Amino acid sequence: MRGNSFRMLPFLLGASTAALAGPPFQTDDPEPIDFRNYEFYTFASSDGTPLETDTAGPALEFNWGAAPNLHLHIIVPAAAIFPADGPRAFGIGDIELGIKYRFIQETKHRPQIGTFTMFEIPTGSAPRGLGVGKTWYKVPLWAQKSFGPWTTYGGAGVTVFSVPGYRNYPFAGWLVQRDFGKKWTLGEEIFYHGPEGPLAPQTRPSTLVDVGGYYKFRDPGFQLLFCYGHSAVGQTENYAYLGLYWTWGKKADTDKPGDQDKPAAFRSPGGRGQSSAYLP
């Protein structure tokens, strides 16, 4: 971020995450990975305005299905900032921890609903602009429904700061994606965030339109994730994500409603954190 701040990116996602649902999109979803399953990502992402471009990468993300309907999440990013009128900086960014919990299951006529609370730990250098300097939070609510090869999900939340120069701001997004054969899944999202404060590059609201998806090298265990988007309304902003995804673990006993034709681990890679949901 400009001055003593840093804006870490997700994904699409989503939000990163999320999985894609989450990575690579900025909008996230409520679906945790299966119990006793694991996900690993390595990725790079970028978010830029006329004031500054912030990047993450290489970054590492790990998700663990710690209990039914709940997974734990961590991202450790290398970070870089490129201000339009100041010195560049490189180093470790703020580490992200998260808990995704689904409290309403999907049925034939009802979407699944859950939350993905995130805690950004101040490991990045605030004086160099690679971190905020204090722990900050994301508190969202997400919903998802599947119809054959189609899946739609979205929701809204608030990012909470306690640091001068930053302000609490709302965010919201919605995405539609479709499977094309056995290899491709493509989607498009609309994602909004409010102004983030005078120390952030995102000083005004912005609404972005992002397009991306996944290519399965091995179904479902190894995938390529990609996304690019640009603002349609508000402050000029660009978003990009490119990553690799692996999943492994105990096979789920039963498929979730609406997902009978999809491998358990592929239903939605991860759950967007800095990698797939939108973060400052």
Predicted features and spans:
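Bacterial N-terminal signal peptides that target proteins for export
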Residues: 1-9
